[in-house]
Amino acid sequence: MTNKRAYKALIQMLHQKRSTTEWDALLNDLLTPKERESLAERWQIIQLLASGMPQREIAKKLSLSISKITRGSRVLQQGRGGFKQALKKMKK
């Protein structure tokens, strides 16, 4: 299976409806602790940016470099819209 096909298969697998417990088990099996921490950190950055908090304040609050926050801001503004869709769905 090519990487492209494997990625599509992964997307299909992730699309299946799961409980919070099932998601936790899947992510624990799929990702290393560091990868899970990085994803949670990135999501926290996106949520704070979307709330209107200034980048420097986020960097200070999370003890992260301003470049990490700027990257999150750039993806939120110029990315493919995945974060915006997720934020919108969470508000419902």
Walk through the language-model features, giving the residues of each.
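Short, amphipathic alpha-helical "recognition" segments used to contact nucleic acids or chromatin
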Residues: 39-53
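General nucleic-acid-binding
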Residues: 1-15
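Short alpha-helical "recognition helix" segments of helix-turn-helix
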Residues: 57-62
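Short, solvent-exposed alpha-helical "recognition" segments
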Residues: 73-87
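Short, Lys/Arg-enriched anionic-surface-contact patches
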Residues: 22-41
